[in-house]
């Protein structure tokens, strides 16, 4: 088990998202898994109906939306 720190506003939002006796870890995992499923659903919806160049364009647009946070050592 690991400890993480989040801003107060993030804590409050996670607290509101909890269902029943769900832990914060459960909430975060649910959010992550939901995001993965949406990505898979999008790919399945377009599978076979787009040309390779159209699919590549969509993939590149989605990659640009993805933010990576860098950490100073």
Swiss-Prot record:
Signal peptide: none annotated. It comes from the Archaea. Coiled coil: none annotated. InterPro entries: Put_antitoxin (IPR003847). Keywords: Toxin-antitoxin system. Possibly the antitoxin component of a type II toxin-antitoxin (TA) system. Its cognate toxin is VapC16 (Potential). Belongs to the UPF0330 family. HAMAP family: UPF0330 (MF_00794). This is Putative antitoxin VapB16. The gene is vapB16.
